[in-house]
Amino acid sequence: MPLAASPARAQAADPRIAEAVKPLPEDLKAGATVVAYDKTTGARQVLRQGTNEIECQPKAEDGFVRCYNKILAPRRDMEAKLRAEKKSDKEVTDAIAAATKAGTIKAPQFGTMSYRYSDDPQRIKLLWVMSVPNATPEMLGVSTVSQRDAALQGHGMPWMMLPGTPGAHIMIPINATPLSSGSSK
């Protein structure tokens, strides 16, 4: 009689899990929770329960693989539900900002990290993002000049977006690694 696959083996064999943890540093990959969202309802599905503070999503419709601290999970849940309702990017951003201001969802803590990967050659392949709510370039000594084009050439440096707002964050392109240089491993 053939043996049924154990849930752990089925999880390990799911290619979405390997894809989802791709942007993470090696020491965070094995313990990351992996979730996916139903496109029509926004409902969360846990593909693998993790043991650390990181949660990842396989490639979404926008082409990005994302990982983030679990403190951001309610924000991602809300985003998934709004996208299932066919809300525009601006409507999603505005709703999340309003919910954060109202205290319905928590703002990320200063220094909270997120990780993003894309295999689209018109996007930065490997990008780490540090949340710095309400910070300004003067407070941190960081540029606000986008390094996107330089990062696409493998020469990007960090820059701040949305300075002085609760959504302020520093974009950190990761250059000269096998993954950022186009290797899929």
Give the label of every model feature segment.
Residues Q11-K185:
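Primary mode marks residue(s) on the alpha4-beta5-alpha5 output face of response regulator receiver
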Residues A4-Q11:
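Sec/Tat signal peptide C-region and signal peptidase I cleavage site
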